[in-house]
Amino acid sequence: MVTSVISAGDAANLGVQTTGGNDGVLVLRSGAAGAKVDALSIAAVGTATFVGEVAGVTAINSGQIGGRRNIVYNGEMKVAQRSASETGLGAASGYFTLDRWKADLGATAGRFTMAQVADGPSGFANCLKLTTTTADTSIAAGELFILSQKLEGQDLQQLKKGTSTAEQVTVSFYVKGNAAAVYVCEIYDLDNNRSITQSFAVTTSWNRIELTFAADTSDPLDDDNAGSFSVQWWLHAGATYAGGTFAVNTWNDVVQANRAAVSGFTSIFDSTSRTLFLTGVQMEIGATATDFESRSYGEELALCQRYYYQTVYGGSDTTIAHGTAGSATVAAQCGSTHPVTMRAIPTLAEAGTLTAYDGSANTDIALVTNSSSTTNVSFNCSASSLTLGRAVQILSNAAGDYLTVTAEL
C-alpha cells in the first residue's frame, strides 16, 4: 500500500495525500489487529467508495431521510378546493374550506369563519384562520368544537401500535391567536376507542409547538382504508368533555369527561375578538420534531383528491362528463375518470346547475343514480328534449356549477 502523509498544504487547507505528490488511492482501514479491512477508498479522481453501511445519517426519528416523514395531509394549508373562506359556521360538522381539515361541532351557539389566509410564519405562504363571529359563554354540557384530520389505518402501520416495539409520535405545528389561550391536542384511536392528550399554549406571536406522544403497546390499528387515527385540536368543550381529570401524555380508553379537562382550557367562543391561526402541521415517528416537510402544490392536491375533488369550471360550456341519451329524458350512464384513485366509492352531488347537451338540445339535469367506482365517475341523470342514442356532454356553464366527488373519512 502506498504510504500517505497528512500535509498542511497552504495556510488555509489541510489535506491528505500520497507521498511525493504521486497519484494514488487513499484508503482508510479499520478493524481488529491483523484483521483490518478497507472502510473507505478515495480514487485519484475523487470518487469515494464506502465498503460498509454509512450509519451516521441513515435515519431521522428512526425513519428514512428521503422524505415522507409527515403523515398529515395539507399541513401547509395549501389546498382549499371547496372554498377559501366560509362564514356563519357552527351549526353542523363538516369539511368547509381547507382540504382534509374538518370542523366537528356539537350543540354550540357559537359561530365562526374558517378561512385560508396569507398570514403564515416565515416559509409558509398560507395558514388556516378561525374567527369567532358569535360568542357562546353559556356553555352547555354537550358542547364541543374540534378541528380534526382523520387518517387511514393502512397509512399508520409504521407506528407499530399495539406491539412491544410501538413508536412514539411527535406532532408539531405553528400557531398564534389574538390573545393568550390554552387548548388541547389529542390523538384519538378510532379503531380501539383510546386516546392520548396534551395541552399547549397560544400567544399573539407565531410559535412552533412540539408535542411528543407516548407509544401505545396496546391495541393495534386496522390495516385498511377506514379511519384509524384522528389528530385533533379541542377548541371548545362543555362539562361532558371537560368535567373530569386531564391525563397528560398517557394512552387510556376514552373517558369523555377527561378529554379536554386541562386546567385553564380556553373556549374559542369566549369573545367575538377571538382568533386562531394554524399552519405547518406535521406528525412523524419519533421523539423529535424535524423541520417541516414541504410538498409541492401538485403533490398535495393529488393527495387531497383521494378524499374529495370537484370539477373545475374552465369557461362557458366546460365538459365534465360524457354519456349517451337513453331516451328523451334520460342521459344514460354518463362518466369520466377520477384524477386519482379515491379512498372508497365516492358520493356525488351537483352544485349549481349542470346541463346535458346532445348536439341540439341543452337542458338542465338532475342526478338519479350513482354507479361510480374508486377510479371512475359513473351516473345516470334525468334531462329533457334529448334524442335517443345521441352522444351527450354534461356541461358546467358557470363558476358555481360543478360536480362534487367525495370519499372523506
Language model region names:
Residues 1-69, 284-292:
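Intrinsic low-complexity, repeat-rich intrinsically disordered segments enriched
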Residues 51-409:
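Extracellular and organelle-lumenal recognition/adhesion modules and their flexible linkers in secreted
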